[in-house]
Amino acid sequence: MVSERGLDVLRVIVQDYVSSREPVGSKSIVERHAFGVSAATIRNDMALLEEEELIAAPHTSSGRVPTDKGYRLFVDQLADVRPLTPAQRQAIHVFLGESVDLDDVLARTVRLLAQLTNQVALVQYPSLATSHVKHVELVALSTTRVLTVLITDTGRVEQRVVELAGDPDDAFLAVMRTRINQAVGGLGLAEAATRLETLSDEVEPAQRAAASVLAGTLVEQVLANRQERLLLAGSANLARTERDFPGSISPVLEAIEEQVVLLRLLGEMEADQHGVSVSIGRENAPFGLGETSVLTSGYSSSGGVLARLGVLGPTRMDYSTNMASVRAVARYLSRLLEER
């Protein structure tokens, strides 16, 4: 059991090590922090922390550094995360507020998060398990070419140009537009794909061929939207922190290239009392990321969590500030999507 002062000692060790990248000794703790006790007393506290495997001694230093277990206790004991500065909040508001559609806002979000935290930023596209067809539009481009537009309730837009035999007129497109929206509006993507496959059977025989082509194209668009997607930015930030990885940084770079692995990791993370999920060091080993920490938060457009965003970096990171950035960006993104 770690005492209250022991927790305070662990806290300053984490903060000082994150700030300096140098092992922390009892003398520097006494000099820099107002504990009101001797260096010998702090050494005893540090010895107890080491027995609990919360800190460890690098082989060339008399100071101590936090372990994965120490970082975990530090994060779990955070009373609150450090608030963003007014300038940071304004940057989020301005940069994301200029976006024009879902693709643009998510691309801006991942770049902004990488800049705010100096870590690798991750933004998952809205969860397909909760996506539904909002609207389908058919636009005549010429006498034989039609633009099909699929819009989901999560803001994703998929467009295709299709060639139709014959000469489909505006009346035909109006009828098909109405039939399609009545058939699949509000349906989940999987259910919508199944429904579209039978839609051409319900039109007049003379229009069936064109209807079949339109329905088939829309099925392809629905299935394309069922693919999970993840945006990344800031991979160069890992290179600047290469010293924080005891081994080679290559396995980490290889792991973040595997979107399936990252999506599985995000799917297993749950938020704590601060609204942010934190997975540290060895907790990420099954995903090939045992030397990293991952911080994520969910975002939504109408109350339910649609997807997650976050950052990935070395275990030696400023958890409080990065958690605040992740949480603030997720909250602003949710508000932005709800307004659209």
Swiss-Prot record:
Keywords linked to the UniProt accession: Repressor, Stress response, Transcription, Transcription regulation
InterPro entries: GAF-like_dom_sf, HrcA, HrcA_C, WH-like_DNA-bd_sf, WH_DNA-bd_sf, WHTH_transcript_rep_HrcA_IDD
UniProt KW Glycosyltransferase keyword: no
Gene Ontology biological-process entries: negative regulation of DNA-templated transcription
GO molecular function: DNA binding
Entry function: Negative regulator of class I heat shock genes (grpE-dnaK-dnaJ and groELS operons). Prevents heat-shock induction of these operons.
Similarity remark: Belongs to the HrcA family.
Name of this chain's protein: Heat-inducible transcription repressor HrcA
Organism expressing this protein natively: Clavibacter michiganensis subsp. michiganensis (strain NCPPB 382)
Gene from which the chain derives: hrcA
